[in-house]
Curated annotation (Swiss-Prot):
Probably participates in a plant defense mechanism. Disulfide bonds join C5-C21, C9-C23, C14-C28. The keyword Flavoprotein does not apply. This is Cyclotide mden-K. There is a cross-link at G1-N31 (Cyclopeptide (Gly-Asn)). PROSITE patterns: CYCLOTIDE, CYCLOTIDE_BRACELET. InterPro entries: Cyclotide (IPR005535), Cyclotide_bracelet_CS (IPR012323), Cyclotide_sf (IPR036146). Keywords: Disulfide bond, Plant defense.
Amino acid sequence: GSIPCGESCVWIPCISSVVGCACKNKVCYKN
């Protein structure tokens, strides 16, 4: 939840979720 993954999730889910990123405030974050 603190490290930006450089991906947005406004229209599509986080592709980076495969490496532990999750959507938060329309941006993908890790931890």
